[in-house]
Amino acid sequence: MKSAFKSEFPFEKRKAESERIVQKFHNRIPVICERGGKSDIPDIDKRKYLVPGDLTVGQFVYVIRKRIKLPAEKAIFIFVNDTLPPTAALMSSIYQQHKDKDGFLYVSYSSENTFGDDALFSEE
């Protein structure tokens, strides 16, 4: 899925912004979070996040759930490079493995595991 953020801002501008963020906030990770293509979950009101490196994926999912006011009975999945990251993984680890060339970590969320069961077993 093509990121709307990438479409809106040229690479040079995104790279300069992520470098400025990382330099200013050493222990924070610049994350872009956008709704996945065919999801019935509402759009998020804010897509740019500065996430503490020691936050787990599960804690980040909780933050996203709160931002979109998702009821507890509704499932949500987040994807990084079309894979479902382990819930206990630290965001700093996911960032090191999957950050984009522009310096941002791109995360999408969906109400379905749209990439099949194989995505549940992504390697760290």
Curated annotation (Swiss-Prot):
Keyword Repeat attributed: no
Database matches in InterPro entries: Atg8-like, Ubiquitin-like_domsf
Membrane topology: Lipid-anchor
Propeptide segment residues: 117-124
Lineage: Eukaryota, Fungi, Dikarya, Ascomycota, Saccharomycotina
Pfam families from the UniProt entry: ATG8
Protein name (record): Autophagy-related protein 8
Localization annotation: Cytoplasmic vesicle, Autophagosome membrane; Vacuole membrane
Keywords annotated in UniProt: Autophagy, Cytoplasmic vesicle, Lipoprotein, Membrane, Protein transport, Transport, Ubl conjugation pathway, Vacuole
UniProt similarity note: Belongs to the ATG8 family.
Any one annotated GO CC term: cytoplasmic vesicle
Chain positions of site Cleavage: G116, D117
Protein function: Ubiquitin-like modifier involved in autophagosome formation. With ATG4, mediates the delivery of the autophagosomes to the vacuole via the microtubule cytoskeleton. Required for selective autophagic degradation of the nucleus (nucleophagy) as well as for mitophagy which contributes to regulate mitochondrial quantity and quality by eliminating the mitochondria to a basal level to fulfill cellular energy requirements and preventing excess ROS production. Participates also in membrane fusion events that take place in the early secretory pathway.
GO BP term, example: autophagy
Gene3D superfamilies: Phosphatidylinositol 3-kinase Catalytic Subunit, Chain A, domain 1
Record lipid sites (Phosphatidylethanolamine amidated glycine): G116
Record note on modification: The C-terminal 8 residues are removed to expose Gly-116 at the C-terminus. The C-terminal Gly is then amidated with phosphatidylethanolamine by an activating system similar to that for ubiquitin.
